[in-house]
Swiss-Prot record:
Species per Swiss-Prot/TrEMBL record: Helicobacter pylori (strain P12)
UniProt keyword annotation of rRNA processing present: no
Pfam families: CRCB
Keywords per UniProt: Cell inner membrane, Cell membrane, Ion channel, Ion transport, Membrane, Metal-binding, Sodium, Transmembrane, Transmembrane helix, Transport
GO BP annotation list: cellular detoxification of fluoride
Protein's recorded name: Fluoride-specific ion channel FluC
Signal peptide stretch: none
Length: 130
């Protein structure tokens, strides 16, 4: 029997549970914003960093396909969430919180990309997997 789907499902359960936990731990007030989806923002930035790091290791075949499916597809797929990002942005716009919405979109995209790049760089240069 092929356990690929079970690995992805198990990882997804772990990742989504972690996302829920992080979301509950984060305050809704952030910097000068009264309402900011800090939980979703945080998991997406953390997830970008981790996927950059693990993505490099996957390309270099440091771990097997099953672990990649479990961790990258499952855990990180469940942990990060583009759909919640879109919903959080829409809610900010509906409440006329335009500065928060713009800050959230720009911050998520810019810091997300930087997180991926830093994760990749660290995996490549400090783990010794070239």
């Amino acid at each position: 029997m092929n356990f690929v789907f079970l690995w992805a499902a198990l990882g997804g359960a772990i990742g989504s549970s972690l996302r829920y936990f992080v979301g509950k731990m984060m305050p809704s007030k952030f910097l000068m914003f009264e309402s900011f989806p800090l939980g979703t923002f945080s998991v997406n930035i953390i997830g970008c960093f981790v996927i950059g790091f693990m993505g490099h290791l996957a390309v270099k075949k440091v771990f097997g396909d099953d672990f990649g499916i479990f961790f990258i597809t499952g855990v990180l797929g469940g942990f990060t969430t583009f759909s919640s990002y879109g919903l959080d942005t829409l809610k900010l716009l509906q409440k006329s919180q335009y500065i928060e919405a713009i800050s959230y979109v720009l911050g998520t995209n810019i810091l997300g990309f930087i997180g991926v790049a830093i994760g990749w760089f660290l995996a490549k240069n400090f783990v010794g997997v070239n």
